[in-house]
């Protein structure tokens, strides 16, 4: 009887502990019940999450100190710091010459710019169709490789609506009962015959870049001496998965946007020192005409040699008048 009594006490304490735990977690359980209203739904999500954790870790891309250099940023973003070229070599290294692989990588980086150049080399309709076929099949193989780190559901969500079904078939088709080359050849041939090859090539290139990098991390200083930080911001706003750690130059621009006179003067000084003040006028609609008039009135005849802006020959040429106007406002 004593043993039974002790067992009952233990059971009561266990039940009390479980009840207290449920009560303590009730608010969390209530929130979970909104998305997973049944035991089956919760179990299904647990299984899906565990399966997702078994996949290879996605590539994370870190970039820092952009300083408004939009052209360098765009190239590094498009090439994923060499990840794209690595995937091209991994898929085609044994079968395709090095220069052809380099051209294909460049096509993936800049499809809209590179595609017309490569097409122009084809001297006949037959040669163009052959190039379309080879390029589409190679891009499909590369896309299949970069998608291997993701679930099929994730890849489907990344597909463009206009051609998502066909791309899904090309990426995930099974060939137990039919010939792979014949199946691909029929689909690719239909794409070319209907004049959609260019669109599919561009969409495949964009999809490869999307899937090649799972997350982008920006570490500080989007703004500074570079000419177009606004382009960088626009691209980051369209990126599928990015986080940003703001730098000291970014905080200065935020302060300027918030109306701090000190921050406004600092931003003006930096843009004038590097002859980037046109960005303030063209991209942010800030009129510097009044500043220029005041500067000409008080400093127009001064020695401005130490106030001359730093210039980049690649962005020139610069006239003497342009440099003078910038220097006098800088002073």
Predicted regions and their residues:
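Feature recognizes metal-dependent phosphohydrolase scaffolds
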Residues: 3-331
């Amino acid at each position: 009887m004593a043993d039974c009594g002790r067992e009952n006490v233990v059971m009561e304490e266990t039940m009390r502990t479980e009840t207290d735990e449920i009560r303590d977690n009730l608010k969390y359980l209530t929130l979970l019940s909104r998305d997973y209203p049944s035991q089956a739904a919760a179990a299904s999500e647990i299984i899906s999450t565990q399966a997702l954790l078994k996949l290879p870790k996605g590539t994370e891309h870190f970039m820092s100190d952009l300083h408004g250099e939009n052209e360098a940023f765009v190239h590094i973003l498009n090439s994923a710091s060499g990840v794209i070229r690595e995937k091209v070599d991994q898929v085609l290294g044994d079968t395709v010459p090095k220069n052809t692989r380099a051209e294909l990588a460049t096509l993936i980086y800049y499809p809209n710019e590179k595609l017309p150049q490569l097409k122009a080399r084809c001297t006949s309709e037959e040669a163009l169709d052959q190039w379309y076929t080879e390029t589409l099949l190679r891009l499909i193989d590369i896309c299949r490789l970069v998608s291997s780190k993701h679930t099929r559901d994730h890849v489907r969500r990344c597909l463009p609506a206009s051609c998502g079904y066909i791309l899904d078939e090309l990426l995930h088709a099974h060939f137990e009962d039919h010939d792979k080359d014949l199946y691909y050849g029929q689909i690719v041939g239909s794409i070319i015959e209907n004049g959609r090859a260019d669109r599919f090539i561009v969409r495949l290139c964009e999809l490869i870049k999307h899937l090649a990098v799972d997350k982008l991390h920006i570490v500080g200083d989007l703004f500074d001496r570079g000419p177009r930080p606004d382009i960088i911001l626009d691209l980051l706003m369209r990126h599928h998965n990015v986080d940003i750690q703001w730098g000291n130059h970014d905080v200065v621009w935020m302060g300027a946007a918030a109306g701090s006179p000190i921050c406004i003067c600092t931003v003006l000084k930096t843009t004038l020192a590097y002859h980037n003040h046109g960005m303030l006028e063209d991209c942010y609609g800030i009129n510097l005409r009044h500043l220029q008039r005041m500067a000409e009135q008080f400093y127009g005849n001064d020695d401005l040699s130490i106030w001359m802006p730093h210039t980049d020959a690649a962005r020139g040429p610069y006239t003497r008048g342009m440099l003078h106007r910038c220097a006098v406002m800088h002073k």
